[in-house]
Protein backbone atom coordinates (compact mmCIF):
# COMPACT_ATOMS: atom_id res chain seq x y z
CA UNK A 1 0.00 0.00 0.00
CA UNK A 2 1.39 3.41 -0.93
CA UNK A 3 1.59 6.14 1.68
CA UNK A 4 -0.61 8.43 -0.44
CA UNK A 5 -3.60 6.18 0.27
CA UNK A 6 -3.50 6.75 4.04
CA UNK A 7 -5.90 9.15 5.74
CA UNK A 8 -4.64 11.35 8.60
CA UNK A 9 -6.89 12.72 11.33
CA UNK A 10 -6.12 14.66 14.52
CA UNK A 11 -7.63 13.32 17.71
CA UNK A 12 -7.38 13.00 21.48
CA UNK A 13 -6.49 9.85 23.42
CA UNK A 14 -9.51 9.06 25.59
CA UNK A 15 -8.52 5.72 27.14
CA UNK A 16 -5.46 3.50 27.52
CA UNK A 17 -6.04 -0.15 26.61
CA UNK A 18 -3.81 -3.24 27.05
CA UNK A 19 -1.00 -4.13 24.62
CA UNK A 20 -0.02 -0.54 23.77
CA UNK A 21 -3.40 0.26 22.20
CA UNK A 22 -5.48 3.36 22.78
CA UNK A 23 -9.05 4.52 22.28
CA UNK A 24 -8.84 7.78 20.31
CA UNK A 25 -11.67 10.27 19.81
CA UNK A 26 -11.21 11.98 16.46
CA UNK A 27 -12.18 15.59 15.86
CA UNK A 28 -15.13 14.42 13.74
CA UNK A 29 -16.56 12.65 16.88
CA UNK A 30 -15.67 9.09 15.77
CA UNK A 31 -14.00 6.74 18.25
CA UNK A 32 -11.34 4.32 16.97
CA UNK A 33 -8.80 1.89 18.36
CA UNK A 34 -5.19 2.85 17.58
CA UNK A 35 -1.71 1.56 18.33
CA UNK A 36 1.58 3.45 18.35
CA UNK A 37 3.78 3.43 15.26
CA UNK A 38 7.07 1.55 15.38
CA UNK A 39 9.22 4.70 15.30
CA UNK A 40 7.34 6.06 18.31
CA UNK A 41 7.99 2.80 20.18
CA UNK A 42 11.65 2.80 19.16
CA UNK A 43 12.18 6.36 20.41
CA UNK A 44 10.15 5.62 23.58
CA UNK A 45 7.61 8.39 23.05
CA UNK A 46 4.99 8.06 25.79
CA UNK A 47 1.31 8.54 24.98
CA UNK A 48 -1.06 9.25 27.87
CA UNK A 49 -4.79 9.86 28.17
CA UNK A 50 -5.66 13.40 27.09
CA UNK A 51 -2.76 13.75 24.63
CA UNK A 52 -3.45 15.28 21.22
CA UNK A 53 -2.24 12.88 18.51
CA UNK A 54 -2.20 12.44 14.75
CA UNK A 55 -3.75 9.14 13.61
CA UNK A 56 -3.08 7.44 10.28
CA UNK A 57 -5.84 5.21 8.92
CA UNK A 58 -6.38 3.08 5.84
CA UNK A 59 -9.54 3.71 3.81
CA UNK A 60 -10.39 -0.01 3.99
CA UNK A 61 -10.90 -0.19 7.78
CA UNK A 62 -11.96 3.07 9.42
CA UNK A 63 -12.21 1.57 12.92
CA UNK A 64 -8.47 1.01 13.44
CA UNK A 65 -5.50 3.32 13.14
CA UNK A 66 -1.86 4.02 13.94
CA UNK A 67 -0.68 6.94 16.09
CA UNK A 68 2.14 8.62 14.17
CA UNK A 69 2.65 11.88 16.10
CA UNK A 70 2.01 13.26 19.58
CA UNK A 71 1.55 17.02 19.72
CA UNK A 72 3.38 18.92 22.45
Swiss-Prot record:
One of its GO terms (molecular function) is ribosome binding. Signal peptide: none annotated. It comes from the Bacteria. Gene3D superfamilies: Nucleic acid-binding proteins. SUPFAM superfamilies: Nucleic acid-binding proteins. One of the essential components for the initiation of protein synthesis. Stabilizes the binding of IF-2 and IF-3 on the 30S subunit to which N-formylmethionyl-tRNA(fMet) subsequently binds. Helps modulate mRNA selection, yielding the 30S pre-initiation complex (PIC). Upon addition of the 50S ribosomal subunit IF-1, IF-2 and IF-3 are released leaving the mature 70S translation initiation complex. This is Translation initiation factor IF-1. It comes from Caulobacter vibrioides (strain ATCC 19089 / CIP 103742 / CB 15).
